[in-house]
Regions:
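Short conserved micro-motifs at the rims of enzyme active sites and ligand-binding pockets
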Residues: 14-16, 100-102, 139-140
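Surface-exposed beta-strand/loop patches in extracellular or lumenal glycoproteins
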Residues: 93-107
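Solvent-exposed beta-hairpin/edge-strand motifs
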Residues: 103-118
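Hydrophobic, well-ordered secondary-structure elements that form the walls
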Residues: 46, 90-92, 111, 132
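Short, solvent-exposed loop/turn segments at secondary-structure junctions
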Residues: 7-11, 64, 93-96, 141-144
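Glycan-recognition and catalytic regions of carbohydrate-active enzymes
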Residues: 2-87
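Conserved active-site loop/cleft motifs that coordinate metal ions or position small ligands
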Residues: 1-5, 88-91, 112-113, 138
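C-terminal beta-strand-rich structural cap/linker in extracellular carbohydrate-active enzymes
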Residues: 122-146
Length: 146
């Protein structure tokens, strides 16, 4: 669930007045700020992925969520659908750059970045990732935005 204006980084507390009080509408003003526009675009991309790929969110899927017990700064989500398609989402949620060890599910030789179609070969990777950086990989290039 995205709280009202959460996709643009609203600048007052959610509890300002009350959680469900009407909040000032500032989206046109906020979207002129590059960082807020980037956040909005990220939400839009992830919501488009979900809308275009119900196979991963409804019905018969395998889902694996990995959060390091000693390192809460990285997250990994892997899912596969009954029709043989896969996605992997992983990111750095720490406050600085770090190397993330990624072991993608076996059985897929090529992965593609959802946002730009860049190829990832093999299953083992250790990308250096800036704080807040994430990758959404898919097993079929036709699922990519570009």
């Amino acid at each position: 669930m995205i709280w009202q204006f959460g996709e643009i980084g609203y600048d007052i507390s959610i509890n300002d007045g009350d959680r469900v009080d009407k909040k000032p509408y500032k989206a046109p003003e906020y979207l002129k700020v590059a960082e807020r526009k980037a956040l909005y675009d990220t939400y839009a991309m992830l919501l488009k992925f979900r809308k275009d790929n119900p196979r991963f969110f409804d019905g018969d899927v395998n889902f694996r969520w990995a959060v390091g017990s000693s390192n809460q700064k990285e997250r990994h989500i892997y899912s596969s659908s009954a029709d043989g398609k896969h996605y992997a989402l992983f990111g750095n949620f720490g406050t600085g750059t770090q190397t993330i060890s990624v072991n993608l599910p076996s059985g897929v030789s090529k992965w593609y970045q959802y946002d730009n179609g860049a190829e990832w070969n093999g299953s083992s990777h250790s990308p250096s990732m800036a704080e807040g950086q994430f990758y959404l990989l898919v097993s079929d290039r036709s699922m990519c935005l570009r």
